[in-house]
Amino acid sequence: MTVQLTTLIVETTAGEECPVEFLGDSADIVYFISMAHTERYGADHPLAKAAAVLKRQLRVNMAPLLNFADARVENEEEERLLERLWQDAAPVAAAARDVAQAIEGSPQLRELTADFPELPARLRELAEMAAWAAERGAKVRLTFVI
């Protein structure tokens, strides 16, 4: 039996392989951005609460991180959705960096994300990947597998 881990996939249009990679499990980012989507509906999960603090109290622009979808497609409509996910890399880099910095700098956010202690490190790695793409004028796409 093969066990597939939840993974964030970061693709670029750079035409070359990004030399930066995740140094640990990227599932924490997938869980965080997924819960950030549910925050507007009053989700009670600690990651959703962290997203609410980031968005509403600290005014961190998380929008570029919330532009993602399942990498597996089952029909043409989902394929079109994946194509619409390409976005400028610099805002993704800034958002990932800003969220990581906010988590590290806030006792409240550290407490809310305590079950995901590597989240800031993974976000910084994502920021490095996106910055690398931005330096090349490339776009990025965030997808995941579960």
Language-model features, listed with the residues they occupy:
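Acidic (Asp/Glu-rich) sequence patches and key acidic residues
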Residues: 1-146
